[in-house]
Amino acid sequence: MTRDTGASEPVGTLHAIVLDVNDLESCVGFWTEVLGKETSFKADKYCRIGGDDDPPSLLLQKVPEQHEHKNRAHIDLDVKDLEVAVQRAVGLGGTKLDEISEYGITWAVMADPDGNEFCLVRHS
């Protein structure tokens, strides 16, 4: 079996990133401020932040299960000033978990109010 690594038609395009959350309201408030985007759809168990004109959007999905383990995937956000971005995210309800510098890149590992991990990244 061989794998074609050349350019071809994609299976699909990235439309949304979905995060499972327990507290939908606090996460909506946090992520709309962090991303600087408004909600484009909201229902009992879902809220979409951003729209079709600026993909990918972030879809928050309310689930009953608690966040107990490290995320297998996470969001990276590029920032101009890491310290300012960390302070702002913490002020909005986030938590700083770690700060790492490797290969000329520094990033802060963060968690949203529901424990979902993401990184604020400054490229040197």
What is each of the regions a protein language model found here?
Residues 1-29, 55, 73-75, 121-124:
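N-terminal beta-strand motif that seeds the catalytic metal site of vicinal oxygen chelate
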Residues 37-71, 113, 117-123:
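Conserved short beta-strand elements that form part of the metal-binding/catalytic scaffold
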Residues 13, 69-71, 102:
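Residue-level preference for beta-strand/loop junctions
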Residues 34-39, 92-96:
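Conserved acetyl-CoA-binding loop of GNAT-fold acetyltransferases
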Residues 23-24, 75-114:
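Vicinal oxygen chelate
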